[in-house]
């Protein structure tokens, strides 16, 4: 059976976009979208080879952010608004990595959901 090679679809995007960073206690997910909300590129710490507790480190966050930003930069994105959600480590490292690739960060907005005394939180760890 012959294998068919699939060509990646290269689409030019508008220079403006948004970066959504979800930093949980266990992982980091970075999604770059255009103004309409269509995904341009995405990356996560697990996708970049980090496993276990190494996924939630500032270095993993930096590598993940660079991977997603390079792909978006190559497609033509230049200016982004950053939306951060979650309490995880490496939130600042992800933003610095975006600037290092060449994306101009216009605004940074923290959209972490905070309960108005909703669900009971998980019990404290005893290590």
Curated annotation (Swiss-Prot):
The keyword Magnesium does not apply. The keyword Glycoprotein does not apply. Keywords: Ribonucleoprotein, Ribosomal protein, RNA-binding, rRNA-binding. GO terms for molecular function: rRNA binding; structural constituent of ribosome. One of its GO terms (biological process) is translation. PROSITE patterns: RIBOSOMAL_S11. InterPro entries: Ribosomal_uS11 (IPR001971), Ribosomal_uS11_bac-type (IPR019981), Ribosomal_uS11_CS (IPR018102), Ribosomal_uS11_sf (IPR036967). GO terms for cellular component: ribonucleoprotein complex; ribosome. Belongs to the universal ribosomal protein uS11 family. Part of the 30S ribosomal subunit. Interacts with proteins S7 and S18. Binds to IF-3. This is Small ribosomal subunit protein uS11. It comes from Chlorobium phaeovibrioides (strain DSM 265 / 1930) (Prosthecochloris vibrioformis (strain DSM 265)). The gene is rpsK.
